[in-house]
């Protein structure tokens, strides 16, 4: 419910609200800023140089919460050291099926997936690009590879370069708006 997610965050024992991310300008910061703006919360961003230092400070009580990837948080979640409040993806994570999405928590339309992409230089010959795409599709569909990826917290999927370009074109305006509103710069 809306109240529980907001209450979980706003009832932190820390007098000054802050949250950790795995770095300035990362999807971790963007997802946090997107949510806190929608929730009407003023939360100070504490950027870390990666997930590990942010998680260390979360576990040590230096920050009250963090926005991180499922794969980075999964070991601590499995050990019961931290609690997942919500996932930012459009659907529940197969790895955390009991954890609601932000939309299910009362924030419809809030969605931000973290994804990884294989990239190559501009001007890559079409034949090389086609071979790379085919190889990547085969690797991602290989059951053994998929099992290994799932075991470390990934939800593997494949998208062609065309689909990836469409995704980037769709997400870029949202990211620009969040960056402008939260004064996120490339410093």
Question: Where do the PLM segments sit?
Answer:
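Conserved, function-defining micro-sites of small-solute handling proteins
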Residues: 1-187
């Amino acid at each position: 419910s809306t109240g529980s997610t907001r209450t979980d965050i706003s009832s932190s024992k820390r007098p000054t609200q802050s949250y950790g991310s795995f770095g300035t300008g990362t999807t971790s910061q963007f997802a946090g800023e997107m949510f806190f703006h929608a929730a009407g919360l003023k939360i100070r961003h504490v950027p870390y140089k990666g997930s590990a230092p942010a998680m260390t400070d979360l576990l040590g009580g230096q920050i009250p919460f963090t926005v991180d990837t499922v794969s980075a948080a999964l070991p601590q979640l499995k050990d019961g050291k931290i609690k997942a409040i919500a996932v930012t993806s459009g659907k529940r994570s197969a790895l955390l099926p009991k954890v609601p999405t932000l939309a299910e928590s009362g924030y419809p339309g809030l969605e931000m997936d973290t994804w990884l992409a294989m990239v190559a230089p501009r001007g890559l010959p079409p034949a090389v690009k086609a071979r790379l795409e085919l190889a990547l599709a085969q690797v991602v569909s290989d059951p053994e590879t998929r099992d290994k990826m799932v075991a470390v917290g990934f939800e593997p999927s494949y998208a062609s370069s065309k689909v990836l370009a469409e995704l980037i074109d769709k997400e870029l305006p949202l990211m620009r708006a969040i960056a402008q509103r939260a004064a996120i710069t490339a410093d």
